[in-house]
Swiss-Prot record:
EC number, as in UniProt: 6.3.5.-
Subunit note: Subunit of the heterotrimeric GatFAB amidotransferase (AdT) complex, composed of A, B and F subunits.
Organism: Yarrowia lipolytica (strain CLIB 122 / E 150)
Membrane topology, record value: Peripheral membrane protein
Enzyme class: ligase
Record keywords: ATP-binding, Ligase, Membrane, Mitochondrion, Mitochondrion inner membrane, Nucleotide-binding, Protein biosynthesis
Task performed by this protein: Allows the formation of correctly charged Gln-tRNA(Gln) through the transamidation of misacylated Glu-tRNA(Gln) in the mitochondria. The reaction takes place in the presence of glutamine and ATP through an activated gamma-phospho-Glu-tRNA(Gln). Required for proper protein synthesis within the mitochondrion.
Source taxonomy: Eukaryota, Fungi, Dikarya, Ascomycota, Saccharomycotina
Name assigned to this protein: Glutamyl-tRNA(Gln) amidotransferase subunit F, mitochondrial
Length: 176
């Protein structure tokens, strides 16, 4: 079993629909644990970082001065938009290319993972702490205390349900 610390309410609903349930001690219980263990232990679903790093070390021998110049030209706009200085030496650029190749190799291995039957991620929400009682309680439909705060109560000027912002900002003339 897998112990969890925090989980979003939507994740609990999605997990419950897929046969994953949470026990009172914070452990996840799955209906079909044998299938999950079989998938996790199959050789085609396993690879190690040593394997990935050793593969990328062999490909680093192929970097020529021509490749170095081409990559430098392609990376220049990326460095500029990120407000980073270009590497000042060929050794630094060589190291950067080696790191990028390792990362691309990792991404290609991740793309090879079978994700059939996995729902795509539709949104990212902040993770909140939940107790077991909150996770198992029925939703009453009443808004929680964080929803009851009226943001307009702090506004100096308002028009209906909108803030009013005055345009009385004076522009200072530049002094020389």
């Amino acid at each position: 079993m897998l112990r969890i610390a925090r989980v979003s309410h939507n994740a609990v609903k999605m997990a419950s629909s897929r046969g994953i349930h949470f026990s009172s001690d914070g452990f996840i219980k799955m209906k079909d644990q044998k299938h999950i263990l079989k998938v996790m232990n199959s050789p085609e679903n396993q690879w190690s970082t040593d394997e990935l790093l050793s593969h990328s070390d062999h490909s680093s021998d192929e970097i020529t001065s021509e490749t170095l110049q081409k990559v430098s030209k392609k990376l220049a706009p990326i460095f500029k938009s990120a407000a980073l200085p270009m590497p000042d030496s060929d050794e630094t650029m060589f190291s950067l290319i080696k790191t990028l190749r390792t990362q691309v190799n990792l991404v290609s291995h991740i793309h090879d993972i079978d994700v059939s039957g996995v729902a795509p991620l539709t949104c990212l929400t902040p993770i909140k702490d939940f107790t077991y009682e909150q996770l198992t309680a029925e939703d009453s439909g009443e808004p929680g205390p964080e929803v009851l705060w009226d943001a307009l109560s702090c506004a100096e000027k308002k028009d209906g349900r909108f803030f009013v912002v005055s345009r009385d900002i004076k522009q200072e003339e530049p002094t020389q």
